[in-house]
Amino acid sequence: MSQSTATYINVIGAGLAGSEAAYQIAKRGIPVKLYEMRGVKATPQHKTTNFAELVCSNSFRGDSLTNAVGLLKEEMRRLDSIIMRNGEANRVPAGGAMAVDREGYAESVTAELENHPLIEVIRGEITEIPDDAITVIATGPLTSDALAEKIHALNGGDGFYFYDAAAPIIDKSTIDMSKVYLKSRYDKGEAAYLNCPMTKEEFMAFHEALTTAEEAPLNAFEKEKYFEGCMPIEVMAKRGIKTMLYGPMKPVGLEYPDDYTGPRDGEFKTPYAVVQLRQDNAAGSLYNIVGFQTHLKWGEQKRVFQMIPGLENAEFVRYGVMHRNSYMDSPNLLTETFQSRSNPNLFFAGQMTGVEGYVESAASGLVAGINAARLFKREEALIFPQTTAIGSLPHYVTHADSKHFQPMNVNFGIIKELEGPRIRDKKERYEAIASRALADLDTCLASL
């Protein structure tokens, strides 16, 4: 198929990936037609018509370079990511993590793109894969049915999917502050989380209520398949008590403060279990329950989650919900630049490609956007080094075993190993990987 001669590039979908792709293309002097159906047609999960809306957590996760997602964010900053820049401008306290005021952040991304002289925003649903120009499809896991059918046809009609869930959000003014305490795990960063401590007796009662609570039904023909990184809390609870105690209710590093007078097990300095609440907006009036994505019926959420100390009278401004995420057979369908193997004028980006997470989705949009622009200019494709996070992630999702392919977060395990003797200390090893990654990225960019 010959390269398109159109004078613009289409970007379909203005989520994190599409917003990033549109910006990267326009930054390179190429007109963009950015299509977004929200505002004309709603999705089950989105609450606004803003671009890059965060529908699950408000966290971009760890910010340290000894964390793979922290490395990926730093690489994206060096590539002038619109998502990272606006995220930084709308940060809220989150200890060692990067969390944002979700509304302020999405509004600022929307304003920047809508006011860009080379970006034409078109509100409307796309039901066919365009063939008029180079196109980046970034319609996300909530792709409309009509377009999803066309994309699934590329899979031979056998699309993949998993279920994703969001955690409840609570009005802070309804939290009993006498029963919670402010602290970040291991006192890392500023004290940013409200911690709801549980004794063993409280935890066991909570676990029993959670595992017996009624879930909202799935369609009869759909199996329950969850992404491990966003598993409903009730599913996790049914795997066993230790799954929660080593997961979202892990008490390690969250010792009681000296002035704590609430119930505790004997003289233990650390609770048996802890539920953490994280600030969800800049005003600090909303908090989400960390790791408590759920598919329980709303009445059951209220009943069970009000068993958490401090939340006995909590008001839920949003209950947890679950939705089906579709993703592609990327190892068979896409190249390392997220370009279609069968149609070189077509790129895909975001969670539909099998990357998992806000930052990873935006990163895929950045890679796809840059390479769509380079194709437009008839320049050689830019494949980032596998020693970098932004190079290793697209390499993984396009080279994984197709038969067992599942969505993947960025992690040090997919980045090319260091040469020479293995560094035993994990922190030092990750620091060395990050140092090499940033040096290699700078070298790559300097060669362009």
Curated annotation (Swiss-Prot):
It is found in: Cytoplasm. It is an enzyme of class 2 (transferase). This is Methylenetetrahydrofolate--tRNA-(uracil-5-)-methyltransferase TrmFO. It comes from the Bacteria. Its EC number is 2.1.1.74. PANTHER family: GLUCOSE INHIBITED DIVISION PROTEIN A (PTHR11806), METHYLENETETRAHYDROFOLATE--TRNA-(URACIL-5-)-METHYLTRANSFERASE TRMFO (PTHR11806:SF2). One of its GO terms (molecular function) is tRNA (uracil(54)-C5)-methyltransferase activity, 5,10-methylenetetrahydrofolate-dependent. Belongs to the MnmG family. TrmFO subfamily. PROSITE patterns: GIDA_2 (PS01281). Catalyzes the folate-dependent formation of 5-methyl-uridine at position 54 (M-5-U54) in all tRNAs. Keywords: Cytoplasm, FAD, Flavoprotein, Methyltransferase, NAD, NADP, Transferase, tRNA processing. It catalyses: uridine(54) in tRNA + (6R)-5,10-methylene-5,6,7,8-tetrahydrofolate + NADH + H(+) = 5-methyluridine(54) in tRNA + (6S)-5,6,7,8-tetrahydrofolate + NAD(+); uridine(54) in tRNA + (6R)-5,10-methylene-5,6,7,8-tetrahydrofolate + NADPH + H(+) = 5-methyluridine(54) in tRNA + (6S)-5,6,7,8-tetrahydrofolate + NADP(+). FAD binds at G13, A14, G15, L16, A17, G18. GO terms for cellular component: cytosol. One of its GO terms (biological process) is tRNA wobble uridine modification. Its cofactor is FAD.
